[in-house]
Curated annotation (Swiss-Prot):
GO terms for molecular function: nuclease activity. This is Endoribonuclease RegB. Activity is stimulated 10- to 100-fold by host ribosomal protein S1, which also helps confer substrate choice. It is an enzyme of class 3 (hydrolase). It comes from Enterobacteria phage T4. Essential to the early nucleolytic processing of a number of T4 messenger RNAs. Specifically cleaves after the GG dinucleotide GGAG within consensus 5'-GGAGRAYARAA-3' (R is a purine and Y is a pyrimidine) sequences found mainly in translation initiation sites. The keyword Secreted does not apply. Keywords: Hydrolase, Nuclease. Its EC number is 3.1.-.-. It holds the Pfam family REGB_T4.
Length: 153
């Protein structure tokens, strides 16, 4: 199997752009969280997100615009993160406990970003959310899958 060099080059350029943009986004989130008096969190992206952005020809500038709006929703994200995680397969559910949905989606009504919570890591103080998908669909509705949705302005 051969790798298309244009895709390889585009992916590496996009990865570098994501790295620099995410430093700025995470700084904005840290400052907004401090100003709101809530715990900060850290955003990451997956390689899968880069591949889908290239494959679906999603404009990264548009994606970054939505990522930058997350700083205005630190309270909602913190509320999501403060919920107890769903029990592992071998653990029992506790009656009456509302568990954190498996996925958080942030949307402007057209672009949908899907996040999952990363497993806690002792090296990092703040919890992390990893963006794994980006979909453009203005008619998309929240599905039956376990998720929470934050709508930006």
């Amino acid at each position: 199997m051969t790798i298309n060099t244009e895709v390889f080059i585009r992916r590496n350029k996009l990865r570098r752009h994501f790295e620099s943009e995410f430093r700025q986004i995470n700084n904005e989130i840290r400052e907004a969280s401090k100003a709101a008096g809530v715990s900060s969190f850290h955003l990451k992206y997956s390689q899968h997100l880069l591949d889908r952005a290239i494959q679906r020809e999603i404009d990264e500038t548009y994606v970054f615009e939505l990522f930058h709006k997350i700083k205005d929703h630190v309270l909602e994200v913190n509320e999501f993160l403060s919920m107890p995680p769903r029990p592992d397969i071998d653990e029992d559910f506790i009656d009456g406990v509302e568990y954190r949905p498996g996925r958080l989606e942030i949307t402007d009504g057209n672009l949908w970003l899907g996040f999952t919570v990363c497993k806690p890591n002792e090296k990092f103080k703040d919890p992390s959310l990893q963006c794994r998908m980006a979909i453009i669909n203005s008619r998309r509705l929240p599905g039956k899958a376990s998720k929470a949705v934050i709508k930006t302005q």
